Regions:
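Short beta-strand segments
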Residues: 38, 64-66, 107
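Double-stranded beta-helix
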Residues: 2-11, 83-118
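Short acidic-glycine-tyrosine-enriched beta hairpin
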Residues: 63-81
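Short beta-strand His + acidic residue motifs that chelate non-heme Fe in jelly-roll/DSBH
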Residues: 39-40, 59-60, 76, 82-88, ...
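A short glycine-rich, His/Asp/Glu-containing loop-to-beta-strand
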Residues: 5-47
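Glycine- and acidic-residue-biased ligand/ion/polar-headgroup-sensing regions
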Residues: 45-58, 62-63
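A generic "binding-loop/recognition-motif" signal
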Residues: 36, 45-46, 64, 80-81, ...
Length: 118
């Protein structure tokens, strides 16, 4: 069964909203403020696909850094360390499609975090 959620969750780097979820997927729109970045993290139970909707991003995957912009997308496999940073002057928006067996926020192993979260 697919659930359409109405959650808009604030974070120190911006916010995200869950668009839909089921036992095998979750879809979010993520909004990152200019100059902010998410934690450098990895997941044990889910892979992610990111599609950049608007803005400019710096992506780090297992230590490799590259830039992406609107229309670009990337796959992040389970266990791969990753981070996204808004390098533009406007809000960065990307759609995140998660697939796997568990989508809770406790499936985040933070390797580095600008906001002191573990």
């Amino acid at each position: 069964m697919i659930t359409v959620a109405d959650s808009n969750l604030e974070r120190p780097w911006g916010r995200y909203e869950v668009l839909s979820s089921s036992d095998i997927h979750q879809v979010k729109n993520v909004y990152v403020l200019p100059g902010k970045r998410l934690s450098y993290q990895r997941h044990e139970k889910r892979a992610e696909h990111w599609f950049i909707v608007t803005g400019d991003a710096r992506i780090i995957l297992d230590g490799d850094s590259f830039e992406m912009s609107a229309g670009d997308s990337i796959d992040i496999e389970i266990g791969v360390a990753h981070r996204i940073e808004n390098i533009g002057s406007e809000e960065l928006v990307f759609t995140e499609v998660q697939t796997g067996t568990y989508f809770g926020e406790d499936d985040i192993e933070r390797l580095e975090d600008d906001f002191g979260r573990s």
